[in-house]
Structure formats: C-alpha cells, structure tokens
Amino acid sequence: MRGIRSKIPRALNAGAKIECVDNTGARTVEIISVKKYRGVKNRMPKGGIGDMCVVSVKKGTPEMRKQILYAVIVRQKKEFRRPDGIRVAFEDNAVVIVDDKGIPKGTDIKGPVAREAAERFPKIGTTASMIV
C-alpha cells in the first residue's frame, strides 16, 4: 500500500451506505470503521478515496449478507483536487470488497476507479476496466 499524492477529503462517515461495484455478491454495504483512522474521542471515523474500511453487507446474496468484510473506497461524490489542479468528482460513492492485504475478492469491477485508489492498491488497478 502506497501513499496518495493528493489530499483526499474524507467525505464518507461511519454509517454511510454505499454501493459495492464488484461481482462478489454484495450490493449495498455500510461503513463500520475506517482502517488507520486517527481521530478525537467520540468522533465518527471518516473515509475517502483509497481508504480501507470495515463494512457490513446490507443487501446482496444470502451468503454475503450480514458479513463483516474489508472494502476500499474507489469513488466518492465529494470533489477532490489533484496536484496538477484538476478537480475530480464522481456520480456515486462506491467500494470494492478486498481481503486484509488489499487484494480484491471479485474478478470484475463495474464503472471507473479513481487513479489514487489504483495507485495505492495495484491489484484493484489491474482488475478495474477504467481508471480515471
């Protein structure tokens, strides 16, 4: 896992329900916590693009529902600025289910993936069909 060059705003709080865009069987997940988040006492953990989260599967196949898994945020609606000055924003918030080492569990990712997430997790970059 590498560092991200641009400063990503952490726009997704714990409790946010997000679409899962891979073919693992999960459709909607809820963020429980964000890995390596360091905040103040009683502050809700927040995540942005490229952050690994602990999620609970809310909608999906019966085998996937009610499971606690790891996921990486690959898209967010809140815009962020890249070092070259371009501002990037996506139409939706999306995650990809991964294992504890950051390797995706699915074999296909629907829609675009942010370049920052693909650089931090190279296996997500190779699985993605489109990197923006």
UniProtKB/Swiss-Prot annotation:
Domain of life (superkingdom): Archaea
UniProt keyword annotations, A-Z: Ribonucleoprotein, Ribosomal protein, RNA-binding, rRNA-binding
GO CC field: cytosolic large ribosomal subunit
A GO biological-process term: translation
Pfam families linked to this entry: Ribosomal_L14
GO molecular function terms attached to this record: large ribosomal subunit rRNA binding; structural constituent of ribosome
Transmembrane segments: none
Family: Belongs to the universal ribosomal protein uL14 family.
Job description of the protein: Binds to 23S rRNA. Forms part of two intersubunit bridges in the 70S ribosome.
Description of how the protein assembles with itself and partners: Part of the 50S ribosomal subunit. Forms a cluster with proteins L3 and L24e, part of which may contact the 16S rRNA in 2 intersubunit bridges.
The protein, known as: Large ribosomal subunit protein uL14
Species of the source: Methanococcoides burtonii (strain DSM 6242 / NBRC 107633 / OCM 468 / ACE-M)
